Amino acid sequence: PCDCVLSSFMQSFKLNDAMANFLDLEDSANLYNNVMELWTKYLKSFSINYCSVKYENIVFNFEKTISSILEFLDLPWSDNVFDFQKTAKNRGLIHTPSYNQVVKPIYNKSVGRWKYYEKNMSDIVPILNPWIKKFNY
């Protein structure tokens, strides 16, 4: 949760009503909390079949994690999953704030990055604590 909020806060999103939440660290944390609370309510109210994935698992155990995602989606394994950068480059223009990262190898520098900003984030950790505990961070 802390890395997710920090990443959203640090992105250069095109400003609109939704993205205005990411101009302030506390607003970013509150939005994360609200979205997770809503997701939890949906899970209780509806029969939702979903696959939960941690970014860290993709980074540190790519093949196993992607294999489980493909299995969930009832898709066969293909070694092409290792060539995601090539696929992204062949798509042409990518319209996301992280467009430059899509064509690069998966990297781990974002994992635990929030700890470098721990002092700045100390006020929002209590907002995120329920999710830190729930997701075992």
Predicted regions and their residues:
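Acidic, glycine-rich loop-and-beta core segments that form the ion-binding/anion-interacting portion
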Residues: 2
